[in-house]
Amino acid sequence: MKIINEDLASLKRLVQTKTQQLTDLKVESAVREIIANVIKNGDAAVKDYETQFDKVTLTDFKLSQTVIDDAYNNLDPQVKDALLLAKRNITSFHEKEKATGFIDAEQPGVLRGQKLMPLNRVGLYVPGGTAAYPSTLLMSALPAKIAGVNEVIMVTPPQVDGINPAVLAAAKIAGVDAIYQVGGAQAIAALAYGTESIPAVDKIIGPGNIFVATAKKQVFGQVAIDMVAGPSEIGILADDSADPRQLAADLLSQAEHDRRARPILITDSADLAQAVSDNVTSQLKVLPREAIATDAVNEKGFIAVVAKIEEMFDLMNTVAPEHLEVQLKNPTQYLNLIKNAGSVFLGRYASEPLGDYVAGPNHILPTSGTARFSSPLGVYDFVKRTSFIQYTKDALAKEAPAITTLARVEGLEGHARAIESRFDTYYD
């Protein structure tokens, strides 16, 4: 794993360059065509794309409840227990995110407030094949259910041998209302616009490949989306108290996700940097997903050596990683130095996969530097806020002069006259 010793300004330029994402114009065009076809031809277009891309011919998109129940009932008990533990912890954490509206009646004759309402229907995209992650389904569906979403539906690519049983079991555990065997950009189009069989949703949640991500970008505005997810990232801050073998293992835990994944270590110890690099090399040789992880390490990964701890945090805040591990002496004392990170793991026993599965905080996180302005998925992503006001005549009379003055300053005479009509002033 490459080790970089440069000044802080040069390192910042390096990480910003590595964060930049290029638009693939061919993908943009192909996805635009898929969406237009689904809008025009509905189920027929979706079936054609499933035959073309997933090599599966479907007569019915919706999966029967019998198939879902069988997957749950026949699931390995150890896997089922792990999913149920994850559900308990995810639920207990996200229950604490629930917010309430408010009513303000402090001013005489004035009632103001805000009410929170759950979305009516959301769609969860769950990748298929080797990227079928039941944990991600729990992280998507459970906050929606806690928020009170009326209907949670799931789409996932059909498989020749059937959908991953653990994913189906997780859907049942999380209370998903319906599952449709549809994948790719055509699934996103179906969720956004609806077809004869698949209902349109209010928001689309979940990661996918570049076609799914591009489709989510293109349908945004017709529906809400959670985020446009990029490759997985891990940033680790470590001093000489950290174990280089553990640091290497944590870096590889994300590198094995994707050839474009980004594993980064920033340290003030040159000796630790070399030890971690050596351990990454040796651990890669025995990793089942060696080829994928090796590409990620070589193309996107690096170890940066800086002069002091403050520079470590300064540089990492520029990275704004999806996952941030702080493996320093007394890590909690540095929480106030963390400005940009999707999720933070403090100390050597808070290894990143703990958050992936059972700790409880959501693992659907901002990537590609978007932790500068974005947050993890949560209950708040499945509710909308609506404000309301009520005034008595006397209360309106008190504020009418200010309203009409501002309306006329903005050249909106009709606004002013609407207020004046409440006091029998008309311009007929």
Swiss-Prot record:
Binding site for substrate: S232, Q254, H257, H323, D356, E410, H415
Molecular function terms, GO-annotated: histidinol dehydrogenase activity; NAD binding; zinc ion binding
EC number, UniProt record: 1.1.1.23
Residues passing through the membrane, by range: none
Keyword terms of this UniProt record: Amino-acid biosynthesis, Histidine biosynthesis, Metal-binding, NAD, Oxidoreductase, Zinc
Binding sites annotated in the UniProt record for NAD(+): Y125, Q186, N209
Cofactor (UniProt): Zn(2+)
Disulfide bonds: none
PROSITE patterns named in the record: HISOL_DEHYDROGENASE
Binding site for Zn(2+): Q254, H257, D356, H415
Statement: the UniProt record of this protein carries the keyword Aminoacyl-tRNA synthetase: no
Cofactor binding note: Binds 1 zinc ion per subunit.
Catalysed reactions listed for this entry: L-histidinol + 2 NAD(+) + H2O = L-histidine + 2 NADH + 3 H(+)
Pathway: Amino-acid biosynthesis; L-histidine biosynthesis; L-histidine from 5-phospho-alpha-D-ribose 1-diphosphate: step 9/9
CDD domains: Histidinol_dh (cd06572)
GO cellular component: cytosol
HAMAP family documented for this protein: HisD
Family: Belongs to the histidinol dehydrogenase family.
Chain's role: Catalyzes the sequential NAD-dependent oxidations of L-histidinol to L-histidinaldehyde and then to L-histidine.
Protein's recorded name: Histidinol dehydrogenase
Organism in which the protein naturally occurs: Lactiplantibacillus plantarum (strain ATCC BAA-793 / NCIMB 8826 / WCFS1)
The encoding gene: hisD
